[in-house]
């Protein structure tokens, strides 16, 4: 068993379910405490101390803190590499917190999303600390982030204090962070270098009608009927309009009507109806502009619905310039000639919006994330650790 596999198995056995998800859907309450990241942060802190690394914590919520582990260079810090996976997972039955090795895979909650990245990044950092290849001028910082799966409070808190915590003044020798800093955000990308991802915007649309007796529907106005026309428009004409906008790495923006609620009982004409919509955005699209666009499109079709944003915190799209020096160096180290894009949203957008150039990279396939049988290829896990270690060793 490799060090990386051993660490991942240990991490899976330390549940860190986001407290926003009390239990897995349809699953009974677990027999032990599984919520919050504190078990993982304490465990990693103990391992970091044994490796002689600097350790700090950033409190985000009571009993929920980002962990910051630093390997300082031999000389003055000239540039910074952040290794930034998240520590929380979605919910799961208790059995998924017992790691299982089968056919070259490790199964368990968080195996690919994203404790595989935690294990690969943390092991690479510890191995670098124990070698003679410590960078001369580059500090390597592991940042284990809390709350990615809900409101990304960990990355939002970190970026607000990044200059104090580990990115000196976001400025080094007169050069801005674009030239001297790179965050590698751990997510399952199948070891592809990702420089762009879509944003996630949740909207609520509401139609209003007039209640009446079901025997005399002509005396009322049916809000569900009006909403049916809105849904049809969103899933046909508006979706087709979005398909005409294309991004070179991300493809098209999308819209999905995921929930609907209207009426009170069959014999009453419904006075109100609401739908919940997931609109995936492209770089350059803002939440306010999307809301205005949908409202204008509905008016043009003579449809009436109130449009509001229900996302608890902004979740914008992200795109990082692949020509930035550290991005190019990472790309060369990986042997990848062109970057990729992904459909999902992650902490990279929060860090990038805060002025820290960010890419996404890690072992595992997003298709396994959040599933009832989450797993990661152990060969890919080890290769991911080696690719990261080789890149870190290549830094000055």
PLM segments and residue spans:
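Acidic-glycine-rich active-site phosphate/pyrophosphate-binding loop
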Residues: 88-102, 180, 195-206
